[in-house]
Regions:
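Helix-coil boundary and interhelical linker segments in multi-pass alpha-helical membrane proteins
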Residues: 1-11, 67-88, 119-128, 162-174
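Alpha-helical transmembrane segments in multi-pass membrane proteins
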Residues: 8, 12-13, 17, 21, ...
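C-terminal ends of transmembrane helices
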Residues: 21-24, 94-105, 137-146, 186-190
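Cytosolic, membrane-interface loops and tails of multi-pass inner-membrane proteins
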Residues: 23-56, 107, 192-204
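Short, non-helical or kinked segments that cap or interrupt transmembrane helices
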Residues: 33-41, 102-115, 146-157
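Multi-pass membrane catalytic core of lipid/isoprenoid biosynthesis enzymes
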Residues: 43, 49-75
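Interfacial segments of multi-pass membrane proteins
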Residues: 51, 74-75, 92, 96, ...
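Loop-to-transmembrane alpha-helix initiation sites
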Residues: 126-132, 147-155, 165-179
């Protein structure tokens, strides 16, 4: 690992540790909005629900940016001697979001940050399209409820599809690191889980 690699990994982790839902709540609502939500998750959905539109947009943009910036900047510079380092740069902001250094027990799930990371990989479209496509499929065609199970199913299936479809093995490994981090966060979550349900979207 070279100095540049280490700096981008550290930068990604520290940027990921900024929880924009809490920051947005303080800016727009003068309160910690995550304290109002049942799952206490500092994510985009809770930002919209408990903080309002401006807080939600602020959180969404911040969480996308924290995933995008480290990956985009790292890939825009000189090519690393060890291409494997890209995998760790990809995973760093998501790990920071899930396990922020100042409050390890109260991080987020890393979903929006994952999408931001994959935007930073463009023109490598596979991870972004696979994750978005499967999320849409499980939300609009075969509906999996609640969101906890939908997210678990999406990340597992997206990881499998990316292994199959993405030729760049370092991007694949980065996705696997991200998926493992998100799934570990979900599995260790103490939030109360509603009854698992699968149904076709057009059937009520």
């Amino acid at each position: 690992m070279e100095v540049r690699d280490a700096l981008y990994i550290i930068f990604g982790y520290l940027l990921g540790s900024i929880l924009f839902a809490r920051l947005g709540g303080l800016i727009f609502k003068k309160t910690d909005i995550t304290a109002e939500s049942p799952d206490k998750n500092p994510g985009t959905m809770n930002a919209f629900t408990y903080g309002g539109f401006r807080c939600g947009v602020f959180t969404l943009c911040g969480d996308l940016l924290k995933g995008f910036l480290p990956v985009f900047l790292y890939r825009s510079g000189e090519l690393p001697e060890n291409p494997l380092m890209l995998s760790f740069v990809m995973a760093a902001p998501i790990l920071g979001h899930i396990l922020p250094f100042y409050d390890i027990k109260h991080g987020g799930k890393g979903i929006a940050a994952t999408f931001g990371c994959f935007l930073g990989l463009l023109p490598h479209w596979t991870p972004l399209c696979v994750l978005a496509g499967i999320f849409i499929f499980f939300s609009c065609v075969v509906k999996i409820n609640p969101n906890y199970y939908r997210t678990v199913a999406t990340y597992i299936l997206a990881a499998i599809c990316t292994v199959w479809l993405e030729p760049n093995r370092y991007i694949v490994f980065g996705f696997l690191l991200i998926a493992a981090s998100v799934l570990a966060k979900l599995f260790m979550s103490s939030e109360e889980k509603e009854h698992f349900e699968v149904k076709l979207a057009w059937k009520h």
